[in-house]
């Protein structure tokens, strides 16, 4: 088999739409009968996934793999940085934790990871027809270029043609694209095969004079003006938009606590699709109100975020509502917070030895350590309101939690998972709503508590909904992007 062709998507800045454009290209190539795979040498994200091999990777490449119809593979994201503070991150290489590093230390040493990057890429290139590569931030960060392993530095390593994307929705797209091109070296500019304007609203004819001038000044073709597509596909860069209070006019109200180090917000995305369940994020006690359900999400720093809950008044508000019977569900770090104590005597979670009082809503005790559990799991929910719901989920957490009382679920071998006490539920299972079984059971229970008839709520299975959204994305991008030019840039004929 010949080595895979490739196309790389770089952006003028973070949030330009690289991730979704890569997902669209993965879908388009798959629709065209090609074996496409995504690749991002280094991703910085709080949202991660566990592969079937028990290895950790960024969710952006998981989404792109799903769009391509292939199994997520850690080779698609050999380096993952998970911020744990304003100046440091957990460094994960080939799915395994290498340790904590300050930003300055990582910057000095990251070139040593090039062999890991190239081994992952070369291995994928032997199996795939096309590799869709995503850059990070901007290739024109002139203070970082000398150590670049994710933008033009990577493009040179793998000899990738590049599409440069700018976001017109924020304004200034012509300056973004022109300025980025001007700050690149001549050999880097030569790699750019086309400019793409993303998130356009309105009549493209109005843009024509600007496009012509941009092409004249950069000597590069504009190969697409992609409209602002209303698709519901998880995207790390759109988290800030998702965190804005969503809710809507639905009869049921679910409030997610907006923790400072919130991670894996994707756990709750399936709930947003339920026709009766409004989902919103809250950052203070005033916003909390009186919801039908309170959700405590995962976090990259359980200890600091628990202290934040205390300081901002959300702990007091949550405890009052829980005492009145409001259901509370904690996932991963949120589950740990719900317990009696959190023992970080080694300082592995917060960076300083301490033991904290938990929220006291579950009979559990958590002891943190350096060891991280990573696994894909199957389980059956045993908690009374949702008993029988079958889950396919994954675990990523440090710390061991000892629980008394009833479990939330059981593994196939009979082992217990999570904890339940009255109206409070805790679990380590990420992706617990993806199959739809628990979503249906949870919404049905909440409806019965409120006297609402849930029978008219037709819920599309998450897998089918995701497929529809990928196809919608691909259709929109295919119609707007010159795919002949994209195939030509890769040295391929259009399929």
Locations of regions flagged by a protein language model:
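Conserved P-loop NTPase catalytic core
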Residues: 348-375
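Flexible phosphate-sensing "switch/lid" loops adjacent to ATP/NTP-binding sites
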Residues: 1-320, 327, 344-347, 370-371, ...
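Catalytic nucleophile serine of serine hydrolases
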Residues: 332
């Amino acid at each position: 088999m010949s080595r895979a062709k490739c196309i790389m998507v770089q952006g003028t800045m973070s949030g330009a739409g690289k991730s979704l454009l890569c997902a669209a290209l993965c879908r388009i190539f798959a629709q065209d009968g090609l074996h496409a795979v995504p690749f991002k040498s280094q991703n910085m994200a709080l949202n991660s996934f566990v592969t079937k091999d028990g290895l950790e990777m960024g969710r952006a490449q998981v989404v792109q793999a799903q769009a391509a119809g292939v199994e997520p593979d850690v080779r698609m994201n050999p380096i993952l940085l998970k911020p744990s503070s304003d100046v440091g991150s957990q460094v994960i290489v080939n799915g395994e934790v290498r340790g904590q590093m300050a930003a300055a230390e990582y910057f000095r040493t990251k070139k040593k990871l090039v062999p890991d990057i190239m081994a992952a890429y070369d291995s994928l290139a032997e199996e795939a027809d096309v590799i869709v590569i995503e850059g990070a931030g901007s290739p024109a960060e002139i203070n970082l270029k000398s150590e670049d392993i994710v933008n033009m530095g990577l493009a040179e390593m793998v000899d990738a043609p590049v599409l440069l994307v700018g976001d017109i929705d924020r304004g200034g797209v012509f300056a973004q694209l022109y300025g980025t091109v001007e700050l690149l070296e001549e050999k880097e500019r030569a790699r750019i095969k086309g400019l793409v304007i993303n998130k356009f609203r309105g009549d493209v004819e109005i843009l024509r004079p600007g496009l012509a001038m941009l092409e004249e000044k950069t000597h590069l073709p504009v190969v697409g003006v992609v409209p602002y597509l209303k698709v519901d596909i998880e995207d790390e860069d759109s988290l800030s938009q998702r965190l804005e209070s969503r809710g809507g006019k639905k009869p049921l109200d679910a409030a997610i606590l907006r923790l400072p180090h919130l991670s894996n917000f994707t756990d709750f995305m399936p709930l947003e699709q339920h026709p009766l369940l409004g989902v919103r994020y809250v950052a203070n006690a005033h916003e909390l109100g009186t919801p039908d359900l309170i959700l405590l999400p995962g976090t990259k720093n359980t200890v600091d975020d628990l202290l934040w809950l205390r300081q901002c008044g959300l702990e007091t508000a949550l405890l009052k509502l829980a005492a009145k019977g409001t259901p509370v569900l904690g996932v991963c770090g949120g589950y740990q917070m719900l317990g009696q104590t959190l023992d970080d005597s080694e300082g592995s979670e917060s960076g300083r030895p301490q033991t904290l009082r938990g929220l006291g809503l579950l009979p559990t005790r958590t002891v943190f350590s350096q060891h991280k559990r990573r696994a894909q799991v199957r389980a059956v929910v045993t908690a009374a309101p949702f008993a029988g719901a079958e889950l396919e989920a994954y675990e990523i957490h440090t710390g061991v939690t000892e629980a008394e009382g009833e479990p939330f679920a059981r593994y196939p071998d009979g082992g217990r998972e999570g904890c339940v006490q009255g109206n409070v539920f805790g679990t380590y299972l990420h992706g617990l709503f993806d199959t739809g079984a628990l979503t249906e059971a949870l919404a049905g229970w909440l409806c019965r508590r409120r006297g609402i008839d849930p029978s008219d709520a037709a819920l599309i299975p998450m897998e089918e909904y995701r497929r529809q959204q990928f196809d919608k994305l691909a259709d929109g991008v295919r119609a707007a992007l010159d795919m002949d030019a994209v195939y030509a840039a890769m040295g391929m004929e259009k399929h």
